[in-house]
Design a protein with these regions (language model features):
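Signature of N-terminal electron-transfer/Fe-S-associated modules in redox systems
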Residues: 1-150
């Protein structure tokens, strides 16, 4: 079946199977920034934005994005690069596998809250798992980024 949607503001049409997940479709079509870490919608590595809301693409049937706007890290590259600098400064990016998910979550957080509280930040990032480092470094980096990126 054909699937038509907007990928980073560009209309695309892909051939998909009805039971295919969005992460699979994106990766098959060259969007390798969408990582598949757990394949169970539990780690956040496959996070994308669908109509500006974060979703775990390894658990979302691709057909559900028909006509919608899907944003990957390529669609927020400048913001993601700035956040990556903060992660590096805090030692929060040892392997960077989780970084894409964090970048998209932080983008969504900025859209939702003008001045997020510590609890709101923690609530947003809770689904992003990192096996390399403690979450305090990510939290510190995100907090500094949000404060200075206004």
């Amino acid at each position: 079946m054909k699937l038509k949607f907007y990928l980073n503001d560009v209309e695309v049409t892909y051939d998909i199977q009805p039971d295919e997940y969005l992460a699979q479709v994106l990766r098959r079509n060259g969007v390798l920034s969408v990582h598949i870490g757990c394949n169970e919608s539990a780690c956040g590595s496959c996070t994308v934005l669908v109509d500006e809301k974060p979703v775990l693409s390894c658990g979302l049937l691709a057909a559900k994005v028909e006509g919608k706007h899907v944003t990957t890290v390529e669609g927020i590259q400048e913001e993601a690069n700035k956040l990556a600098d903060y992660f590096a400064d805090e030692g929060a990016d040892q392997c960077s596998f989780c970084g894409v998910g964090f970048a998209l979550i932080v983008h969504a957080l900025r859209k939702e809250y003008k001045n997020p509280t510590d609890e709101q930040i923690k609530d947003f990032i809770v689904g992003n798992l990192c096996r390399c480092s403690g979450y305090q470094s990510q939290f510190n980096a995100i907090k500094k980024y949000l404060k200075e990126a206004k």
